[in-house]
Amino acid sequence: MAALLFYISAIFVPEAIWLLWSFPHWETMHVWNSLSEIPTAYVTAFISGDALLAVIGFWVAAKLIRSGRDYAAHIQWIAGYFAFFFVLAHGWDGTGWQRFTWDPTVTGMPWEPGRTMWVDFATSNVAITLYAMALPTIVPMIAGGYIWLRNGHILAGLDGARASSLAVKGVAIYLLGVFVAFLMAACATVISLHLTTQAGMLVGVIVTITVAYALAFRRGGILQTAISRGFNLT
């Protein structure tokens, strides 16, 4: 918990504040165009929510592991990434990907439905800032995850070499889980956008989760097997 709180307070939350301060339009998905427009309560909830959700996630995962439901604890973080990517890709009205790929500091124009920079966003001010933040965000998380997993396997009675091998596999499977969550979000978004009914978003999410469960998450599924072996679950 101490390591998590340090990571959140020293890296994650400061980065979120930086993005909100430098790109308030992009960080709020273009709901507001400047800091002066954003309600103070929203900023407070945004900053505290970043830390609170991480702590709640840690607490829930710990409760699941202590009750012997290790696999459910892993499903939780995959579900979190799915929700994260789905918000970016779909948003609340199907335009999330357009909002994400629009940087008013480059275009000089506020976002409107239908506007997107497409591949030009990759060289935008927002994108360059995200690239700069990637190293201090991802490296400590990957390195910390490896150390945490290795120490955990050693405490469970495994020798150092076996513990290190499983820790590497665990990190690789974590990255695989993130990628699967991204694919699920993309599929849910595509399905939702092809449905014209008001329930399109819900249908897209349900269909995606159902297919993902059948292919990957059920007992004996691809991801379930990988998680069980990679994290040495019994």
Swiss-Prot record:
GO terms for cellular component: plasma membrane. It is a multi-pass membrane protein. The chain crosses the membrane at residues 5-23, 38-60, 73-92, 127-149, 170-192, 197-217. Its main location: membrane. Keywords: Cell membrane, Membrane, Transmembrane, Transmembrane helix. Coiled coil: none annotated. It comes from the Archaea. It is found in: Cell membrane. This is Uncharacterized protein AF_1499. It comes from Archaeoglobus fulgidus (strain ATCC 49558 / DSM 4304 / JCM 9628 / NBRC 100126 / VC-16).
